[in-house]
């Protein structure tokens, strides 16, 4: 959520910056609502003061033995007017809040301006895509060759965009997640967390999934109950529970940064992606991801973004997977982000780079929703923290890249040396 004071005092400047990301802010409506809020605020305060004064007069008149009925009727009328004004003010404030919750974050000044993914800017590349001297198989074909990816079984169990992994490929999938966690906790300074996969509405509001993206979530409720705000939703990313661990907290600045990681399944309805990536593991309703979250002082967040992106890059480098780093343009960034880097790994069967990590500085956008603050030891003043999140990495897509980049002419899949301790020394699958 943006700073309400900024929306009140500089709506035109905010609108100009939001326009860079293709969002049209209705400044006239905001101004009209703000003017009405001011009127109702003054009216409510005046009515409250008048009723208090008249109520005091009743006691004084009663002490003098005077007829208090006219004063009592007047106080009752003032009370009715006050209740009506309060009700209108509450309705108006709710409308303003709903508008504010639907406004995306302001892009950082150094984010490239653009409409969509075609306007993203490549920052760097690492590694050289392998030149194969045989016909490249995609990960689905390889998975079926080794009996490790069973999409038909998943359709029987659940439906499309799910998979059953078996045998050595299931083990490799687990090994990747363990390797990522070990790297982030032992070398990058993150603390490992195990978090709920179901979260409540407040948690989803805190990180920005609600109210705007309710349709992207899988919601749960007991069959005998009606859907309501007490129902849970499956997490779309571990960013949601990890970041909300600091909701309504005041953290000593000396305790920052807080760096957390977790390996979880992620659940997404993939609304709006019908027909895209229907084959294989690229776009699933359920997929595993190792997530990184940092809670930092405001002045440290831009440096933290570079650091976090480097942590995700390190995973790819140690696995020997070619990738490129891309700065997302204003029109392609996520709702809550003020600056984002995507890492795209080389997928040989598609002859292109595909997203495998997204690392974002969210500034104070989520912190304001969560009321997550830090306190300076010197002056004891509090201020909102900055939050960052990044994939470190998407495990299924890493498996795809590894299978395709390390495939052999006979269909075997070489295990990168760094993963072999997690695979009991296994060098090849197949």
From Swiss-Prot:
Binding site for L-serine: 237-239, 291, 391
Catalytic activity: tRNA(Ser) + L-serine + ATP = L-seryl-tRNA(Ser) + AMP + diphosphate + H(+); tRNA(Sec) + L-serine + ATP = L-seryl-tRNA(Sec) + AMP + diphosphate + H(+)
Positions that bind ATP: 268-270, 355-358
Subcellular location: Cytoplasm
The enzyme's E.C. designation: 6.1.1.11
Pathway the protein contributes to: Aminoacyl-tRNA biosynthesis; selenocysteinyl-tRNA(Sec) biosynthesis; L-seryl-tRNA(Sec) from L-serine and tRNA(Sec): step 1/1
Sorted UniProt keywords: Aminoacyl-tRNA synthetase, ATP-binding, Cytoplasm, Ligase, Nucleotide-binding, Protein biosynthesis
Coiled-coil ranges (or none): none
GO biological process entries: selenocysteine biosynthetic process; seryl-tRNA aminoacylation
GO molecular function: ATP binding; serine-tRNA ligase activity
One GO term describing the cellular component: cytoplasm
UniProt family annotation: Belongs to the class-II aminoacyl-tRNA synthetase family. Type-1 seryl-tRNA synthetase subfamily.
Purpose of the protein: Catalyzes the attachment of serine to tRNA(Ser). Is also able to aminoacylate tRNA(Sec) with serine, to form the misacylated tRNA L-seryl-tRNA(Sec), which will be further converted into selenocysteinyl-tRNA(Sec).
Assembly mode: Homodimer. The tRNA molecule binds across the dimer.
Notes concerning its domains: Consists of two distinct domains, a catalytic core and a N-terminal extension that is involved in tRNA binding.
Protein name: Serine--tRNA ligase
Native source organism of the sequence: Klebsiella pneumoniae (strain 342)
